[in-house]
Amino acid sequence: EAIAAVSAAIRRNRVGISPKHKPVSFIFVGPTGVGKTELVKQLADDLFNAPESLIRLDMSEFMEKHSVSRIVGSPPGYVGYDEAGQLTEKIRRKPYSVVLFDEIEKAHPDVLNVLLQILDDGQITDAHGRKVNFENTVIVMTSNAGSDNKASGAVGFGGSADDQGKERIMKALQDFLRPEFLNRVDEIVCFNHLTKENFCGIARIML
């Protein structure tokens, strides 16, 4: 289901149905160990035929207000002004990339504001005044939001456990992401818990 949703969104962008000058964007939500990061790695390999086209930013390193300067570069007069931003410089040199923002719920709100501008305009200005175009990138954010609570079974008219899980995940995302942010994301992909059949299939592939 997750792979089908990602594939459909990529195809919509390729045929021109999605808005122009806007990168394809996803939020992968689910418990740890269900393959969110592995799918991102495979996506980078399949889209651009190069695993090194994946740019990964761990949001646990961007929890402070000043950490936003590490993305676009430090402003004039501050330490590190001569150094380019970790993200903007990589995209400027390699515009066809998959950008992974891992554990987005840990990011400082100012970092989310920068990301919102990228999702909205498809470009951002770095500390040196240069426009960096994200039109040809794929933006993926991962989160464990809503997955720490045990999914309760369907009772009465409550619907299926999967539907209840998706509702719980959406409520958890809304706790730290504003509506205008969520509305600019192409697809929110919910990863289900792995079943016994899934584990058997993974074991066969690895063996």
Q: What would you call each of these model-derived segments?
A:
Residues 1-207:
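AAA+ P-loop NTPase nucleotide-binding core of proteostasis motors
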